[in-house]
Amino acid sequence: MDTIEIPALNRPVDATVEIPGSKSLTNRALLVAALAQGDSILENALFSEDSEYFAKCLEQLGIPITLNPHLAQIQLAGRGGEIPAKQADLFVGLSGTTARFISALVALGNGEYRLDGVPRMRERPMGDMLTVLETGGATVNFEGNSGFMPYTVYSQGFAGGNFCLKANQTSQQLSALLMIAPYAQQDTIFEVEGTLVSLSYIKMTCRLMADFGVEVIQIGDNQFQIKAGQRYQAQHYTVEPDASNASYFFAAAAVTGGRVRVKHLTKQSCQGDILWLNVLEQMGCQIKDSDDYTEVTGPKQLQGIDIDMNDISDLVQTLAAIAPFASSPITIRNVEHIRYKETDRIKAVVTELRRLGVQVEEFPDRLKIEPGPITPAEIETYHDHRMAMAFAVTGLKVPGIVIKDPGCTAKTFPDYFTRFFQMLEQ
């Protein structure tokens, strides 16, 4: 297995960086552009394993799509809600957004569509969304455990109507259903039982739908109404830089007491993970925001924090990776759902922090990290891109941190380590 050793710095970082387009926005834009009537162009689109699996699935479904990675541009010809292919065998890799969004998309078709992924993807929950699709007219045939891949969707259009679903494990299922709802045969209302995890991602979905011409009426945090007959309009759409992936560069400034500026990303971003800036501010960082960049300057000493990260749970690993350098303990709460991601992220973080000699307490939905010295070690990444990217930041402060399987970042940020090392050279 390949490894990368992170060079520890004896100085603060001082750099300006550019981050590729958002994975979450790229895949949402691909779906709504495929449903729109006419040609859309996505600028600053992300080219990674996740987005390429998504594009391949659209191509198999008969949506004409042209990828230009050198320009970070994707062109596709939307078919106005039609799914041209009547049969397809679709592979989603380890991409949760592809799995959920494509499953919802094929429910609008009239045919037979099999979906499968890598072994870990077969363990990730799909059931609530599939129950809605079945109630709306589809038939789902599971080859193994009910509610999990692989399965075949037999579809004849989505009826719409009133649905109740749980969203305590992932918000991606609700996002998928929201995006297909304008093409239902009647108005659709989704009511969420209990607390909706990652609400910020639902808000991002609704904002992107509005950018393409469709309104979602939200009542409180738990009810969403979509009028039937609305149609997405083809767009020339620029994807924002990925706020989740920018978090590692901002964390580098925080942990070294340095300065990092990320171009073309601002506090006005529609991505919920821009709230990472608020976390860093509470820990003692200074934030400078302009109309075309955001800049973080780290303090001499990071402060501990007790924080609910339900809405920004993709950043748990980023915070955990810098937590040992704080002046007091860091407690991360309300993130049980991250146990169902690319790996059990709570367990993985706890295991690797302990490998580094850090004292950490694990609970079902939270963890508490004590500050203290770190022992160099090789970090297991569990095929999880965010483990590799986050613990690289730890290595800036401690010599001898080695990241195993750095290629796993290809899922959302193929050239992460190239850009990370370029930041260090500035």
Curated annotation (Swiss-Prot):
The active site is at D314. One of its GO terms (molecular function) is 3-phosphoshikimate 1-carboxyvinyltransferase activity. It holds the Pfam family EPSP_synthase. It is found in: Cytoplasm. Phosphoenolpyruvate binds at K23, G96, R124, Q172, R345, R386, K411. Keywords: Amino-acid biosynthesis, Aromatic amino acid biosynthesis, Cytoplasm, Transferase. GO terms for cellular component: cytoplasm. SUPFAM superfamilies: EPT/RTPC-like. Its EC number is 2.5.1.19. GO terms for biological process: amino acid biosynthetic process; aromatic amino acid family biosynthetic process; chorismate biosynthetic process. It comes from the Bacteria. Pathway: Metabolic intermediate biosynthesis; chorismate biosynthesis; chorismate from D-erythrose 4-phosphate and phosphoenolpyruvate: step 6/7. 3-phosphoshikimate binds at K23, S24, R28, T170, S171, Q172, S198, D314, K341. It catalyses: 3-phosphoshikimate + phosphoenolpyruvate = 5-O-(1-carboxyvinyl)-3-phosphoshikimate + phosphate. Catalyzes the transfer of the enolpyruvyl moiety of phosphoenolpyruvate (PEP) to the 5-hydroxyl of shikimate-3-phosphate (S3P) to produce enolpyruvyl shikimate-3-phosphate and inorganic phosphate. NCBIfam families: aroA. Belongs to the EPSP synthase family. Monomer. This is 3-phosphoshikimate 1-carboxyvinyltransferase.
